[in-house]
């Protein structure tokens, strides 16, 4: 008789274990980060380790390389961060901070894992040594100024030509 009483109990435990087995893979899948989320977490780590006064924010993320499906395997990443106006001591997220005009730009390379439970990254960042990065900013600003100047000149020519049209006397 004791065996019969424990029989349904054993069946319930089997059912509970079966349900847990079905639910656990879903919980594991939910802990996998997207490529960009993993990079943003790495940037948070960079900001925590940095001795610079201000936070850095993602400026450019290189295209995602082809990867295997294992979230525990380190994935190669490369991206660019730029200094923001927010001090490191702020509680703001870097995404909520504006970029600092002429802020320091750093090129970062390394690896991240997409498994949120492991949350590991190995990233190193160096000053962006692209010589023409600031030159590009110069040309953008010059283009705006020249565009505004040409617009003003065009308006003056239009006004001048409008005044040359013979007026009819009434």
From Swiss-Prot:
Stretches the record annotates as Active core: 150-162
GO cellular component, one term: vesicle
Proregion span(s): 31-131
Disulfide pattern: 86-97, 108-125
Location of this chain's protein in the cell: Secreted; Vesicle
GO MF, one example: lipopolysaccharide binding
Major localisation: secreted
InterPro entries: Cathelicidin-like (IPR001894), Cathelicidin_CS (IPR018216), Cathlecidin_C (IPR022746), Cystatin_sf (IPR046350)
Mod. after translation: Proteolytically cleaved by proteinase PRTN3 into antibacterial peptide LL-37. Proteolytically cleaved by cathepsin CTSG and neutrophil elastase ELANE.
Pfam families reported for this sequence: CAP18_C, Cathelicidins
GO biological process, alphabetically ordered: antimicrobial humoral immune response mediated by antimicrobial peptide; defense response to Gram-negative bacterium; defense response to Gram-positive bacterium; innate immune response; neutrophil activation
Keywords: Antibiotic, Antimicrobial, Cleavage on pair of basic residues, Disulfide bond, Immunity, Innate immunity, Secreted, Signal
Residues making up the signal peptide according to the UniProt record: 1-30
PANTHER family registered for this protein in UniProt: CATHELICIDIN (PTHR10206), CATHELICIDIN ANTIMICROBIAL PEPTIDE (PTHR10206:SF2)
Domain description: The cathelin-like domain (CLD), which is the propeptide part, does not seem to exhibit auto-inhibitory function, as it does not inhibit the antibacterial activity of antibacterial peptide LL-37.
Task performed by this protein: Antimicrobial protein that is an integral component of the innate immune system. Binds to bacterial lipopolysaccharides (LPS). Acts via neutrophil N-formyl peptide receptors to enhance the release of CXCL2. Postsecretory processing generates multiple cathelicidin antimicrobial peptides with various lengths which act as a topical antimicrobial defense in sweat on skin. The unprocessed precursor form, cathelicidin antimicrobial peptide, inhibits the growth of Gram-negative E.coli and E.aerogenes with efficiencies comparable to that of the mature peptide LL-37 (in vitro).
Similarity annotation: Belongs to the cathelicidin family.
Protein name, UniProt field: Cathelicidin antimicrobial peptide
């Amino acid at each position: 008789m004791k065996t019969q009483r424990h029989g349904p109990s054993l069946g319930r435990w089997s059912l509970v274990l079966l349900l847990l087995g079905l639910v656990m893979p879903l919980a594991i899948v939910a802990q996998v980060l997207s490529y960009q989320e993993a990079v943003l977490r790495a940037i948070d780590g960079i900001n925590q380790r940095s001795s610079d006064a201000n936070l850095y924010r993602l400026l450019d993320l290189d295209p995602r390389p082809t990867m295997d499906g294992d979230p525990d395997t380190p994935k190669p990443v490369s991206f660019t961060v730029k200094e923001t106006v927010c001090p490191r001591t702020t509680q703001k997220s870097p995404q909520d901070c504006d970029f600092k005009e002429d802020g320091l730009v750093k090129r970062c390379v390394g690896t991240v894992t997409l498994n949120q439970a492991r949350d590991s990254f190995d990233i190193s960042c160096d000053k962006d040594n692209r010589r023409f990065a600031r030159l590009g900013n110069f040309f953008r600003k010059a283009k705006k100024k020249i565009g505004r100047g040409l617009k003003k000149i065009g308006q003056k020519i239009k006004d001048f030509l409008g005044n040359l049209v013979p007026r009819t006397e009434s």
